[in-house]
């Protein structure tokens, strides 16, 4: 399939546990569909058209609390689930580090800004930044609540994957 083929779709996935989400864009970057983790079965109807799925990588850090590690282990399961869905459908699944796609959209907080924020406050600000960017790019997307930040991330990750594919920066894509 050529990039200009209007049937090509791009899937972006934030494999978060409670706030995870996904987004599907067409070859022009227009919104096709999006949803929270619990609505993942809607993705199946598009699998034949999806060219590339871009999935946010999950990291477990040595300084994580037990609660954080448990949450991250569930995200790792979701990451593996999405890779299985994509692999089973013959869709190329490309991992992307959170800092990489967020840098592309100018959403990374600088270290000095992070230190000024209270613990937990940085997560809320990051979520609001993602929502604002996604709302600006796709005003018709249902992104009404802060808990929709995973959907916003999914859409932004899909756009990142679409742009990378367009620039031929994914090997073998």
Please state what every model-predicted region is.
Residues 1-173:
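Phosphate- and other anionic-substrate recognition elements at nucleic-acid/protein interfaces
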